[in-house]
């Protein structure tokens, strides 16, 4: 039987958070992620992981306090469900999701939801996997979709009106981000240095509050790229990827 651990205020300092394990360059991001989680425990934030060294976890919380531009009532929102490497194909993802579903039902929630895409995108769940458990598409913006598993006939969550814009006024390269992902902090610093070195106009907009998250101008789980005012992707970029993007756009 697999052994799982739920992070809480007592164990979070000692436990790893699955991503960026043992990589010193991401330690600042890990620290910020842990602080972010600590501040979310009061909202009912759940981080459940396999008791092993690897990326094997699910993370979710009530939609009312989830840092995403999605509005709803009495639903859980899954930020991330990730099972990587040699742990794939062993039923662990199923066990993690089934735990979250049961947890939501035990809390008398109306359902549970998550963000996917019509075609697989980095840092988003796989649509087919959630379909297997009965999740259905309840809203969409371009090729991004909100899937929900309903427990009753009450209203399902929807993307906020602001997210439907998928545009901003600024024409320079602009990146919106949160500290929900431990990889983000290093890439923000790396891209800042790269843009300065190459004399490229690059702006960062940090989403550091629930209000900012709910009113984000696009689909975002933890990162969003804009150029010429248009949303490009949700992919977290390093310097090499950003360089290719700049060349492609120019």
What label would you give each PLM region?
Residues 142-165:
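C-terminal "cap" of GNAT-fold acetyltransferases
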Residues 83, 89-104:
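Conserved acetyl-CoA-binding loop-helix of GNAT-fold acetyltransferases
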Residues 115, 131-148, 232:
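Conserved catalytic-core motifs of GNAT/GCN5-like acyltransferases
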Residues 49, 53-65, 77, 82:
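Conserved beta-strand in the GNAT
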């Amino acid at each position: 039987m697999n052994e799982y651990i739920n992070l809480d205020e007592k164990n979070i300092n000692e436990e790893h958070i699955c991503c960026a394990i043992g990589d010193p360059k991401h330690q600042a991001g890990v620290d910020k992620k842990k602080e972010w989680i600590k501040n979310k425990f009061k909202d009912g934030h759940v981080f459940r992981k396999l008791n092993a060294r690897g990326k094997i976890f699910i993370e979710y919380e009530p939609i009312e306090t989830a840092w995403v531009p999605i509005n709803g009532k009495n639903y859980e929102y899954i930020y991330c469900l990730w099972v990587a490497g040699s742990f794939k194909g062993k039923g662990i993802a199923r066990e993690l999701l089934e735990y979250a579903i049961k947890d939501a039902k035990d809390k008398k929630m109306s359902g549970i939801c998550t963000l996917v895409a019509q075609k697989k995108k980095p840092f988003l769940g796989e649509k087919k996997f959630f379909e297997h458990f009965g999740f259905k598409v309840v809203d969409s913006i371009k090729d991004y979709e909100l899937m929900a598993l309903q427990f009753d006939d009450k209203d399902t969550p929807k993307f906020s009106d602001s997210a439907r814009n998928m545009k901003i006024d600024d024409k320079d390269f602009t990146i919106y981000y949160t500290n929900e992902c431990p990889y983000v902090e290093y890439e923000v610093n790396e891209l800042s240095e790269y843009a300065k070195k190459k004399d490229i106009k690059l702006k960062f907009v940090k989403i550091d509050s629930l209000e900012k998250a709910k009113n984000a101008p696009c689909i975002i789980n933890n990162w969003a790229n804009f150029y010429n005012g248009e949303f490009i992707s949700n992919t977290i970029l390093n310097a090499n990827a950003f360089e290719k993007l700049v060349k492609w756009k120019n």
